[in-house]
Amino acid sequence: MLGGELLIELPVKPPEKQMRNYGLKIKDQKFKYEKLPENFDLLDYDTQLQYAKEMYHLRHNGEWWIIKGQHVYVSGHAWFFFNFWILPEGCLPTFRMEAVEFYNAFEYAMWDDDCFGLLIIKARQEGGTQKVSSGLYDDGSRHKDVLIGMISYDEKIARSSFKKIVAGHNSMHEVFKPKTPKSNKVVKELEFTLPASFSTEDKAKNDWRGLE
């Protein structure tokens, strides 16, 4: 995929028969959202663990799809955004190739030591803030000992953008929602640490949370 003047390399394609939507008619080759288990807390531990392993694998590695006859790589960040990032309207984002390409460039910039970031020229109201908010939350909650911040041309806009990340965290499915102290009142920062009262028993029951 071309991103400006740079060629963005994607992961090696698997055999087509291993791609999602293989064998379907072109009209049926659409992106499909993950089916989240109901009453996750009530599932037995082994079922929770297996589900968590599958979700973390996709979050880290992404997956290849066949969409309308085309091979499309949905990166881990894009997959996370489409399946788990709840918008202010209370729904998941609509699948769009624009977002797929954005996250491919996002990951390229993140992993290239010679790249200092992205300069994005875009129209208003295309969901750019939500895509970036999801990307920041994704990185901040999947890696240990990482600091992530945001700046804007005035404090009001920065606060508004930060609130979107907090809202996404509050709506996050349990399998990806880090533990936070119960007394943690989010004002200027969102901190993920084990509460002092988090017992050894609780930690043992939730050891699948360390899959990241």
Segments the model singles out, each with a brief description of its role:
Residues 1-212:
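Phosphate/NTP-binding elements of NTP-utilizing enzymes
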